[in-house]
């Protein structure tokens, strides 16, 4: 039987979108995700009450479209906005147009190493991730298969989720296996702030009972000493893990924190780490128990496959940060990814709504904290761009 050749890539386009969606933090007033949450900027009183006050939402969403010669379009969304759109249009597009969509390994390699002198992590790798995800979406659509088929197929019949949001008690009602809360007070608020954190944890434990997971997302806000004291105090209330407690660049601090926390408590991080080389540092230095790459920020699916294999060899679980369908299609195929995160993007959060609403159509959500693999059985990542959202193409090439 002759091999069927897929159409080559004809066009790459990059757009920006404002408002809630792939930029998790670009939300309106009164949203739990922007309510006095501890951050590295909390040391400055002017930037303590709101994360938007220091510009957490300045980038907005990046939309990457990749069109094949037959008119099939793959797309993806991530955080990056106009600066990332410039990188996609002016630099990365040259490595895709005229190429076969099956050449994703070579394409990734060329995107990464051509930008290494000004990239390596952060915004540039966000842009690379968006392109890579759009490429996988295109490949799935051309082959009329869901992405998880292309990654080796499902290793279980369903996904199970924990929920991130300010109301773990509601997460329990919705059937999630656990609830991860934002930490509201950082070191600059002293002992009183630490006491408020513990009081909040104690109150939530009384609401959810002893058998429901409770975790803290510290969003890089702490130092090793404060994180250690917080973990020890939280142990009495059954905190399952302490997440991203310190700067993602402080591998030595994470190594120390992992030694310091009470026995049985997990240390997790990786949301703001990127590429196999960054995660290699976390694993070889034994910085954490669970790594949490965001597939839209760490290098895309192509790189996450390498990160996951490295983690498997080191006996570490991979539980990706957020990422909606881009994470779901990956987690369902990995033995060392036993559950997934669901970001509760309702402002309350008192309802289960699609993570990237309103930017995507057809985005599945957990039912009673679970999702059947059949919910992913559509070509590519199985979602469409909402035609009603305002997209802007700031650059061309």
UniProtKB/Swiss-Prot annotation:
Q: Which InterPro entries match?
A: Enolase-like_C_sf (IPR036849), Enolase-like_N (IPR029017), Enolase_C-like (IPR029065), L-Rhamnon_dehydrat (IPR023444), Mandel_Rmase/mucon_lact_enz_CS (IPR018110), Mandelate_racemase_C (IPR013342), Mandelate_racemase_N_dom (IPR013341), RHMD-like (IPR046945)
Q: What is its EC number?
A: 4.2.1.90
Positions bearing the site annotation: Transition state stabilizer: 341
Provide the catalytic activity annotation.
Answer: L-rhamnonate = 2-dehydro-3-deoxy-L-rhamnonate + H2O
Q: How is the cofactor bound?
A: Binds 1 Mg(2+) ion per subunit.
Q: In which pathway does it act?
A: Carbohydrate degradation; L-rhamnose degradation
Which residues does the record give as Mg(2+) binding sites?
217, 243, 271
UniProt: substrate binding residues: 25, 51, 341
The broad enzyme category this protein falls into is lyase
Q: Where on the tree of life does the source sit, at the highest rank?
A: Bacteria
Cite any additional comment in the entry.
Answer: Reaction proceeds via a syn dehydration.
* Job description of the protein: Catalyzes the dehydration of L-rhamnonate to 2-keto-3-deoxy-L-rhamnonate (KDR). Also shows activity with L-lyxonate and L-mannonate, with much lower catalytic efficiency. Catalyzes the third step in an alternative pathway for rhamnose utilization that does not involve phosphorylated intermediates.
The UniProt subunit note reads as follows: Homooctamer; tetramer of dimers.
Q: Which PANTHER family match?
A: ENOLASE SUPERFAMILY, MANDELATE RACEMASE, MITOCHONDRIAL ENOLASE SUPERFAMILY MEMBER 1
Which family is annotated? Belongs to the mandelate racemase/muconate lactonizing enzyme family. RhamD subfamily.
| Name of this protein | L-rhamnonate dehydratase
């Amino acid at each position: 039987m002759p091999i069927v050749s897929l159409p080559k890539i004809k066009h790459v386009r990059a757009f920006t979108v404002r408002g809630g969606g792939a930029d998790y933090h670009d939300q309106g007033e009164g949203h739990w995700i922007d309510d006095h949450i501890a951050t590295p900027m909390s040391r400055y009183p002017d930037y303590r009450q709101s994360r938007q006050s220091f510009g957490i939402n300045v980038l907005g969403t990046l939309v990457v479209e990749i069109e094949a010669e037959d008119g099939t379009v793959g797309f993806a969304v991530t955080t990056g906005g106009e600066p990332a759109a410039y990188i996609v249009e002016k630099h990365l597009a040259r490595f895709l147009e005229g190429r076969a969509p099956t050449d994703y390994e070579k394409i990734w390699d060329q995107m990464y190493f051509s930008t290494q002198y000004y990239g390596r992590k952060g915004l540039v790798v966000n842009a690379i991730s968006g392109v890579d995800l759009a490429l996988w979406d295109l490949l799935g659509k051309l082959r009329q298969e869901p992405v998880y088929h292309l990654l080796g197929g499902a290793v279980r019949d369903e996904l199970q989720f924990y929920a991130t949001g300010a109301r773990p008690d509601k997460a329990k009602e919705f059937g999630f296996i656990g609830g991860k809360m934002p930490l509201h007070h950082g070191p600059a608020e002293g002992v009183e702030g630490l006491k408020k954190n513990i009081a909040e944890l104690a109150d939530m434990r009384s609401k959810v009972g002893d058998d429901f997971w409770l975790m803290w997302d510290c969003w890089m806000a702490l130092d090793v000493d404060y994180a250690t004291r917080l973990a020890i105090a939280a142990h009495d209330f059954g905190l399952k893990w302490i997440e991203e407690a310190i700067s993602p660049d402080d591998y030595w601090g994470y190594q120390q924190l992992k030694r310091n926390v009470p026995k049985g408590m997990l240390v997790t991080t990786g949301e703001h780490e990127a590429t196999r080389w960054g995660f290699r540092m976390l694993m070889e230095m034994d910085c954490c128990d669970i790594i949490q790459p965001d597939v839209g920020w760490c290098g895309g699916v192509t790189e996450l496959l390498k990160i996951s294999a490295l983690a498997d060899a080191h006996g570490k679980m991979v539980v990706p940060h957020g990422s909606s369908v881009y994470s779901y299609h990956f987690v369902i195929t990995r033995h060392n990814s036993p559950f997934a995160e669901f970001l509760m993007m309702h402002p309350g959060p008192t309802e289960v709504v699609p993570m990237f609403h309103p930017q995507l159509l057809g985005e599945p959500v957990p039912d009673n904290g679970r999702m059947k693999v059949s919910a992913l059985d559509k070509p590519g990542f199985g979602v469409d761009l909402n035609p009603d959202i305002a997209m802007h193409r700031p650059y061309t090439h």
